[in-house]
A protein has these predicted regions:
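A structural signal for small-residue-enriched, beta-sheet-centric alpha/beta enzyme cores
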Residues: 1-274
Length: 274
């Protein structure tokens, strides 16, 4: 297979490569971004694979990103780590993982622009790399096994990044919440329960608020007085749902992206044989 792959190398072979790494994915995932610096155009392109077993630490996910800049391995690794932590390490489909994952950043050096010699270029490149990887990460979630909804979970007002992520992942990994999302059920009790058992020390559930979209769902430890089932249902019927939890105990915020849990998820994984 390797000689055949080598002979098939082509500068326009991104889609073939993206197709070649799929497993339970239903479609290839690729993205490109460009930005300008000193009158020059810098390009980044990437492909990714993943549909289930995505978190933690990327699990069965694969991602390959290339850019035409020059860069030392040390700086490239630092930039990659930063971008991964705000993209691929902020998504989850089922909370499951495996021993197989890779994410690579390749600096081809086709351009004479060198990241190590220009701090302004480093900042621009870091932003573009994170943007590209978030686009690929979101594509993985949208193609999650059996997924029918793309769910953003934003936790703000935290005392630390760690506790914001604790709450976000407690919500994202709850089978009861994920099945409620599949049913378009604005079940505030399940969300509040997950926030409560996330393990945040000295959390005051009477102070926090929970929104779905722009609709206030929870305040004062229970269902908000202003909440109406019709408003909640209208939001839940959408394909994209935003859950926002304000812990009201600090200035930190984090966002995690996930899916609902459908009948098809069970079918895909019951039928799959490796």
């Amino acid at each position: 297979s390797l000689p055949k792959a080598i002979n098939a190398l082509d500068v326009n072979g991104w889609e073939d490569a993206a197709l070649g790494i799929l497993t339970t994915d239903t479609r290839p995932k690729g993205a490109s971004v460009q930005f300008q610096h000193l009158g020059r155009s810098i390009s980044l392109s990437g492909i990714a694979k993943g549909s289930g077993m995505i978190r933690p630490n990327m699990a069965t996910m694969l991602a390959f990103v290339a850019s035409d800049v020059k860069c030392t391995p040390t700086l490239a690794q630092d930039l990659l780590n930063q971008a991964v932590n705000q993209s691929f390490n902020r998504i989850t489909v089922d909370g499951d993982m495996s021993t197989n994952d890779s994410c690579m950043l390749i600096a081809t050096g086709a351009s004479d622009l060198c990241l190590d010699e220009d701090t302004d270029l480093v900042a621009l490149f870091s932003h573009a790399l994170t943007e590209l990887m978030q686009e690929l990460a979101h594509a993985i979630v949208r193609d999650g096994e059996g997924a029918t909804k793309f769910i953003s979970i934003e936790v703000l007002g935290g005392a630390s990044s760690e506790e914001c992520l604790q709450v976000a992942y407690a919500i994202a990994h709850s089978p009861l919440i994920k099945t409620a999302m599949f049913a378009s059920d604005p079940n505030w009790g399940r969300i509040l329960a997950a926030v409560g058992y996330a393990g945040v020390p000295n959390l005051d559930v009477n102070s926090l608020t929970i929104h779905i979209g722009d609709c206030l769902l929870v305040e004062h430890g229970g269902c908000a007085q202003s909440y109406s089932e019709a408003a909640g249902q209208e939001i839940m019927n959408k394909d994209e749902i935003n859950i926002r939890v304000d812990l009201k105990r600090g200035d930190t915020k984090e966002t995690v992206w996930t899916t609902d849990l459908s009948y098809d998820y069970v079918k895909i994984n019951a039928d799959y044989r490796s």
